[in-house]
Swiss-Prot record:
GO terms for biological process: defense response to fungus; killing of cells of another organism. Keywords: Antimicrobial, Chitin-binding, Disulfide bond, Fungicide. Has potential use as a flocculating agent in water treatment processes. The lineage of its organism: Eukaryota, Viridiplantae, Streptophyta, Embryophyta, Tracheophyta. It comes from Moringa oleifera (Horseradish tree). The keyword Nucleus does not apply. The keyword Translocase does not apply. This is Morintide mO6. Seeds (at protein level). Residues 1-28 form the Chitin-binding type-1 domain. It comes from the Eukaryota. GO terms for molecular function: chitin binding. Gene3D superfamilies: Endochitinase-like.
Length: 28
């Protein structure tokens, strides 16, 4: 589905979710 997910389990497609610097854990 193209979503990136953070270490807290929240997912989205913006840099807030997809940036490793912001804690992205999957589909980064």
């Amino acid at each position: 589905n193209g979503l990136c997910c953070s270490q807290y389990g929240f997912c989205g497609t913006t840099s807030a979710y997809c940036s490793r610097a912001n804690g992205c854990q999957s589909n980064c």
